[in-house]
Amino acid sequence: MLDINLLRKDLEGVVARLETRKSPQPFLDVERFTALEAERKAIQTRTEELQARRNSLSKQIGQLKAKGEDTAAVMAEVGGIGDGLKASAERLEVIQSELNALLMALPNLPQAGVPVGADEHANVEVRRWGQPRALDFAPKDHVDLGAPLGLDFETGAKLSGARFSFLRGPVARLHRALAQFMLDVQTQEHGYTECYTPYIVNREVLEGTGQLPKFEADMFWVTRGGDDDEATTQYLISTSEISLTNSVREQVLAADQLPIKLTAHSPCFRSEAGSAGRDTRGMIRQHQFDKVEMVQITTAEQSDAALEAMVGHAEAVLQKLELPYRVITLCTGDMGFGAAKTYDLEVWLPAQNTYREISSCSNCEAFQARRMQTRYKTAQGKNELVHTLNGSGLAVGRALVAVLENGQNADGSITIPAALRPYLGGLERLVA
């Protein structure tokens, strides 16, 4: 959530920065915001006047009583002022609620230096690593490579519908090995603390990280059974960023606790609303997929460097898996709702002859912290909002796709990256 004082000081500038994200979408009803602010100021001014008048009358009552004179008229006026103050307080509460709703619908402001553009075509490539392997045969995609190894979309569809998969045998083992390998890299080499988190969370948790209220259509939700008064709607997480980041909600942290670095492997559930017709074949876009997530909680001074480090932590996994990739800076129109700056890592897929996203690393600055009310105490004893960062380290299913396609041989076998072999009992190749 944005700082409302920023809008009060420079509404025109904030609106201009918001419009760079996906113009001409009107993120803020400026007319409504301005009207609410004007009414709020008028009520606050009137409240101060009434309070001053009440204080003056209270003194008069004391003086009248000391003289033995009648106080009924003055006390009646004080009572009327009390009614007016109560009505003002109630109206201010309504106004604040409406202002809060407007703020909750606003995305984060892009950092200075983020490329301005409407969509992915304006993203900027930063660097590449690795050379795509030259194949002397026509590459197969992961669907054809995975079928004899236990990658089964038919059973997934039979059980749950489109965009679900069923893994068995060698490919299921590879999937598990990848997740364990990623966790080990992040915990043993980069200092993250491994966590196991709930996959079902409450509404306020999703509001804290910014998925709600704007993106409810992208979520899966469940209703807990029981009596009517016990029935509760909760949500399946779309990423463990949600639970990891909210683990510090409504806390004041000590400065020496920061940065906090957390990681978790979890399934992720997404309805993929608006993705009809996109990536309908294979594992690239699923309703349920696994991901190893990285989260950092930092001070404002630490967050820019933390983002660069986090990108490096995701890159390390790809490099150890010997997978060619590139790093992209997302433009203003392609960034996620809560991000101030985002890097995407895209892995090379031979069958598609292109790079596809496998990790997204973002600095959300104080945007989520303000929603979660998470602060830290400075050396001067002042409470300041933390900064939050999140990144994929990596998407497990897409890593499996990349290992299958980049490791394929003419006979259909898959060469396992050397770093992954200890997690597969020393196995060097997957063979049907």
Swiss-Prot record:
Record-linked CDD domains? SerRS_core
* One term of GO molecular function: ATP binding
Q: Where does ATP bind?
A: 270-272, 357-360
**Annotated Gene3D superfamilies:** Bira Bifunctional Protein, Domain 2 (3.30.930.10), Serine-tRNA synthetase, tRNA binding domain (1.10.287.40)
Q: Where does L-serine bind?
A: 239-241, 293, 392
Q: Which Pfam families match?
A: Seryl_tRNA_N (PF02403), tRNA-synt_2b (PF00587)
Q: What is its main location?
A: cytoplasm
Reactions this protein catalyses = tRNA(Ser) + L-serine + ATP = L-seryl-tRNA(Ser) + AMP + diphosphate + H(+); tRNA(Sec) + L-serine + ATP = L-seryl-tRNA(Sec) + AMP + diphosphate + H(+)
Give the enzyme class: ligase
Q: Which UniProt keywords apply?
A: Aminoacyl-tRNA synthetase, ATP-binding, Cytoplasm, Ligase, Nucleotide-binding, Protein biosynthesis
List localization entries: Cytoplasm
Notes on the domains: Consists of two distinct domains, a catalytic core and a N-terminal extension that is involved in tRNA binding.
The protein's matches in HAMAP family, at most eight in alphabetical order, are given as: Ser_tRNA_synth_type1
> What's this protein's function?
Catalyzes the attachment of serine to tRNA(Ser). Is also able to aminoacylate tRNA(Sec) with serine, to form the misacylated tRNA L-seryl-tRNA(Sec), which will be further converted into selenocysteinyl-tRNA(Sec).
Supply the name of the protein. Answer: Serine--tRNA ligase
Q: Which organism is it from?
A: Methylibium petroleiphilum (strain ATCC BAA-1232 / LMG 22953 / PM1)
